[in-house]
Amino acid sequence: LANSAASDTLVTTAISGKPARGLRTRYITEVESLTESLLPYPLQYSMSGPLRKAATKASDPDFLVMWSGQGVGLFRQMPAAELIKTLSAEVAEIRSALF
């Protein structure tokens, strides 16, 4: 995730049958290339369950579901306490600039 960008994401129905944004994976690419129609939610999600479970157990990124927004890659990795302090300082700075 840390090395991903918004261009690495897409909105797809391949995983669940409902449109959702995630990182492009081999699984999504393969399913989207099928000529058959995908199943509606929740059937598509249920049918892909065993594969997703096996991929999680094997830590196989090609078949993992990696839901992600367009802000992927913009996060800052730090301890939670440091994050709260940083966000509080940023909010205070923005508030003082606005008021």
Predicted feature descriptions by range:
Residues 1-99:
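Conserved active-site-proximal phosphate/metal-binding subdomains
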